[in-house]
Amino acid sequence: MKFSAGAVLSWSSLLLASSVFAQQEAVAPEDSAVVKLATDSFNEYIQSHDLVLAEFFAPWCGHCKNMAPEYVKAAETLVEKNITLAQIDCTENQDLCMEHNIPGFPSLKIFKNSDVNNSIDYEGPRTAEAIVQFMIKQSQPAVAVVADLPAYLANETFVTPVIVQSGKIDADFNATFYSMANKHFNDYDFVSAENADDDFKLSIYLPSAMDEPVVYNGKKADIADADVFEKWLQVEALPYFGEIDGSVFAQYVESGLPLGYLFYNDEEELEEYKPLFTELAKKNRGLMNFVSIDARKFGRHAGNLNMKEQFPLFAIHDMTEDLKYGLPQLSEEAFDELSDKIVLESKAIESLVKDFLKGDASPIVKSQEIFENQDSSVFQLVGKNHDEIVNDPKKDVLVLYYAPWCGHCKRLAPTYQELADTYANATSDVLIAKLDHTENDVRGVVIEGYPTIVLYPGGKKSESVVYQGSRSLDSLFDFIKENGHFDVDGKALYEEAQEKAAEEADADAELADEEDAIHDEL
């Protein structure tokens, strides 16, 4: 996203907008540049204008009131550029707001090319400057066509990566380039600088390193494929060593690469380590990403990486396998007694990265201690013995992965206990187990929610099977019989147990009757 001098708010517009808000309200003043739309005027207005930002609001909404002065300021600036900011009061136009699926207030939607049926949600900062910058971006073409690329890059200010095609451009790649530009309109700036005398080049200029463009060095025929282009962008358009927070986390996940975290205490400490991590990131580009994370704001995230909150720290998360790696840390006692700040050794960081990429590093496995006493027929697994137990070729092992707070897990517990009792009292071929996933890491198991139930059939080459059925006793019996290696009929065992229990109850009743009769005779 680029901004020119014309996008900067003028002092006059700032003063004008602020003067009309002596008492702050959600509704823009009548003499402002904000257009009021209603159900009977909305469609016609959108269809007759190329670009409109519409605020769906409620007069009582506190967030709407807070944003109102900024919205008016932005409208005063953008009206000169033929960009309209509008308001729709949802308390008076409920059907219109329902039609556009307004989830809450304020909701800001961008309508482009007079299209009333398709809109883009504005999710940026609710300040006049941010709104102006974003809307000016929306008014520009998806691809900036320039004759003098160096001059263009030097004279503009960019806050998102700049994707540039230059030199001799063929039709196939050009179509892909424009398609990607439209898809990622708000993510990157796309620039085309065609010159038939030069060789084709595809480059990415990162805002933090405009003098070091990343150049695509593969085959042009490959990158003309949109999927290949997308994957290349996901990796190369990320900064070498950038700051991570909730707004950019998804981009790192989508890259599919492991993520190295530097947790830092303050900006001075960050600057101390920045050269090292920038160099590591350049050296290992395409293999893993590196980010800094402010421990003052996101220190608890260290726990998600199986690390203690002892900062600074360095850890690696292999998100594909959900494995975590980190430099050794102090005991709690040693950390409490520490008088000097922790220093991360460059060689230790480099060594961990090298070993991780070679597959030689050992992950940090979170695990409870192995339960010495199993006082239930449901076997309690932990991270340390999970693989050993589930890979036992002499048993079909059913595992319930749960969280203690999970309501569905709690409701399943009596049924699961009855399931375990049935097998435990009749056969050693089936083991019913459970694992608290909040306290134990497991490898190779995709757990997207709780409860997750997985069967590990016995035998030497059996594949695990995820249970997808209802959480009834009969369904679980059927699942184990149909997918287990030993073909154990749980229903039959259950019926036998019920019959045996009934016989024992009858025998007990007869014995009681006999004792009563003897007592009466006496």
Swiss-Prot record:
GO function term, MF aspect, one: protein-disulfide reductase activity
Site (Contributes to redox potential value): G62, H63, G407, H408
Location(s) in or outside the cell: Endoplasmic reticulum lumen
Active-site residues annotated for this sequence: C61, C64, C406, C409
InterPro entries: Prot_disulphide_isomerase, Thioredoxin-like_sf, Thioredoxin_CS, Thioredoxin_domain
Site note Lowers pKa of C-terminal Cys of first active site, residues: R126
Reactions listed under catalytic activity: Catalyzes the rearrangement of -S-S- bonds in proteins
Entry's EC annotation: 5.3.4.1
Glycosylated position list: N82, N117, N155, N174, N425
NCBIfam families: ER_PDI_fam
Designated name of the protein: Protein disulfide-isomerase
Species whose genome carries this gene: Saccharomyces cerevisiae (strain ATCC 204508 / S288c) (Baker's yeast)
Source lineage: Eukaryota, Fungi, Dikarya, Ascomycota, Saccharomycotina
